[in-house]
Amino acid sequence: MMKEIKTEFKNNTIAIDFDGVIHQYSRGFQGLDNAYDPPMPGAIPSLQKLKDAGYRLIIVSSRPVKPIRKWLEKYSLSHFFDDVTNIKQPAKYYIDDHAIRFDKTDPNAWHKTIDFIEEGGDK
């Protein structure tokens, strides 16, 4: 069972990547206008939980906005998102399948980041 989530900060935006996070993206890139898979397992109840907690959800993707909006309509998910953009927005959190966590308080953060990449990351 998922724990209750509470928003406590002024910036209550969560920026979410599209391919591989919301859209399953099982066959990789098939063209900018081709979003071919259904939603990722667990995405819909998780999006609902975030909305219920008062978060503003936006999709930030390198894919053009129009095919994402079309896909959201196809799967009746448009109501979850306050915006769809291909420009990075200020957000409290970013959910992305290719992100590397960077701890700005760690003086060795860059060293650890390079080590992670050189070791093959999450393979």
Residue ranges and their predicted role:
Residues 1-123:
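HAD-like aspartate-dependent phosphatase fold
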